[in-house]
Amino acid sequence: MKLYTHKINRIVDGYLDNLNKFGLNYMFEQDLIKITLDLGIPNNNIKFYNLNNSNSNSNNNNNNNNNNNNNNNNNNNNNNNNNNNNSNNSNNINNKNDILYNIIIEEKIDLIIFYKSIFSENANNISKTFNNLTTIIINDNIISNTNNNNNNNNKFYEINYPFKISTLLSGYISGLISETNIIGYLKTNKIQDQTLLDTFYFGARLSNPMVKLMFYTIDYDFKNASNNNFPFQEIIELSVSSLLKNGVDLISSSFENNEYLTFCNILLKQNIKIIGSNGFLISPPLNKDHVLFNSVYNLTLYILPIISNLINNTNTNNNNNTNNNESTNSQFNINLIFNPSISNLIINNINSNLSMIENQILNDTNIILTNQLNNESIIDLGIISGYILFKPISKTIEYGITIVSSILIGALIIIQICIIKYKNKPSFKSASPTFLIFIVIGGIFVYIGVIIWVSGVNVFTCNAKFWLISLGLTTMIGGIVVKNFRIWLIFDNPKLYHIKITNLQLLPWVLGMFLLNVFLLSLITGLGKLTPFKVFPNDEKFSSYEIQCEMMDGGLIALYFLLGYFAIIVMIGIFVSWKIRIVDIEEFNESKSVAYSLYSIVFCLLIIAPLTISKTGHNTEILCSGFIFIVAAIITIMFIPKFWALKIYGAEGSNEIFRQSSSSTSKRKNKSSTTNDPTNLDSISKKSSKNAPKRVNLFLYDFTDDDEESKQSSSSSKGDTIECMDVFTFIESVQPNSEAANEMTYNDDPTYTEPSEQPTYTESSEQPNPTPRTLTATPRTNDLTTPRTNDLTTPRTNDLITPRTNDLSTPRTNDLNTPRTDGILTPRSINSLATPRVEEPMSPRQYHNMMITLSPILEEENIVVVEKDEVIENSDSESESSDSNSDSIIQ
């Protein structure tokens, strides 16, 4: 006797901890081999075949039987009869060209078993074609029996498998064990799976009326895998993860065979217990550790009488069996195997209610369908299709971001050229051209990173975008902070200390920021292991997905440190911008520009930081747009004012110091000749009108790239300061009756008049300020050198024209080289006041600039002078007080 069995899929070895073959098919194979051996049928007479394969699967044995037992004599007679009948129908078989028919003829099959109800039509046709062939079909359709009522062959058998009992038991036990009172279920889109879902939930409600059910429907094409763009394993992982997020602690399914194996494997990875059902045989090691219970059915107990009758050549009428309802537990010998973690109280509860559960199954009207329940008790989470729509970045957005970034890169290159061209102009030199170049280079890095970001998702782009954007922002922010930190140190200097900070001294700070950023990015790359992964904008529906970069937990920690690092740099920059608000020179005061730039960065970082960590959809477009805005805002805020100032003020700048600085080179060349020639009134006038205070000289030579240039600029600036002081010394040391004093009068000036023997004074109101002053007989009013009296009309006596005494080392003469004569030591006479002092007339603009430039430095000294003047007016020693006042002004 030869048996032929049909099944859909075979089970492979090696699943789940050296798990043996399991599943309904394999269980039936083992049981069938066992009972046939007991009946004396050799194993090589049993053949298992997969209908989905074109060739027979010789999983077990060859078809040739060389050694027949004595018990097979009757079988041989039956085989001969079958062969005769089959030969009579050979013409009909050849016309059908059915591989099943060929196998039956070639292998001389006596009995064929179909495992699935979907092949009921094949079983019915074969039974009608081969009248002497015993045909058995196991009906796994829990809705109804197979439509084989018109089959008159008395060797056709139908066995109804009790799926409902197993499913109801799974639901009953799940309701007892669940701690959250929320259970999950996964089913396919088959009609019978909906019935299994109803049965599962009905069993759970029998044991726990408060339980809730959440389920997904998996719409997967198992026959044509090419119709699916998503692997079945990933779909199960998505659905299981979503159920766990909703508070589910137990999950069951209607999957079978390989699909059930995949489902169990995923549950084990999530550390979720497996609910065995549907007769799956699981090895004891797995059962003890991971499976809550098994319900195993021995189908061969019902098949055994059929095979025995076939061996004994006894025909049994199966009409009563064909239309039978599902067999009960006693007929299939159900065995429940529980996990040791389940308490004895639950086990006793199940065993005591097992008969009640069977009676509920036999009466289908007691089962409540899911569509009859309210939404509070059962929740349909939707359908997960095997073909999930992939939504990449829109081509319009990709092209738009790429084009905009490319245009901005071109604009930055043009700005870079302008910086190099106009680096010596006040608007750019005052802003440190070296660091302006760093800012522009950083912006180019960011835009290149944005272009790579939207070009696609792979391992390279996931890492490159982090490196380029992060290093670009560090270079930009570092350049802004460091260059303004120097301005703060120079201008926030009340005591006017000499501070020299060159670009070479600042570059290590920018380099340090850059290297620290490289270190953090290395940690992100090494620990994060950025790889592409699929993101679902709608976590519950899973209708579409995007591909983004996934980062491991170690990389996320380094990313948090990187974001904190940027926050610290930005806060320092905001503080520095607040400190340099005191600078009253437009080219140096970038407080508003820096503040606005950093505020825009803070605003965008508050949006970018959460999106960088999250896995939501469409964050690529938001992040790229944010980075484009940050760089564009910084470049616009920092450079538009500089180009505007270049257009308005040109090469001279907005302040007198830049005009002085531009002409200081030519003045230094003629320094020796002009300072040694007191008769050169023009050079003396220019020196005396120099409006550069010490505060200006502190930063005129500080914005250089090397120490040598800084030293040269420093010495020249100091020379200018000494040069200005020499003018004061020369004017104050000229004697009233000397030739030098007489030469200082403007003889060619038509407004000049010779003084009389006695000076004639006019009221201060007759010569309004700032009328050009001349040292005629008319005294000066409201000036630091004008003789003061109580009513401001009486001329000051013994004023600054009184010669200095022995406190000066060498007395000056007309040419400033001859020692002073003895006449210097004689006291001043009244007539000496008649000799006028002459200064070069000053225009209102020059006088205004001089007063504004000197006022920050001399403000405190003027107060001291006024106080001293009041004391001098009541003092008897007017000569000594005048010398003290002149010395304080010169200092």
From Swiss-Prot:
Lipid bilayer topology: Multi-pass membrane protein
Biased segments, Polar residues type? 742-767, 783-820
Keyword field contains Glycosyltransferase:
no
Alphabetically list the UniProt keywords.
Answer: G-protein coupled receptor, Glycoprotein, Membrane, Receptor, Transducer, Transmembrane, Transmembrane helix
In this entry, the parts of the chain located on the Extracellular side of the membrane are 1-399, 455-461, 527-555, 614-625
The ranges of region (Disordered) come to: 52-91, 660-689, 742-827, 869-891
List all Acidic residues biased stretches. 872-881
Query: Can you supply one Gene Ontology CC term for this chain's record?
Result: extracellular matrix
Tell me the InterPro entries matching this sequence: GPCR_3_C, mGluR/GABA-B-like
Spell out the protein name for this chain. Metabotropic glutamate receptor-like protein N
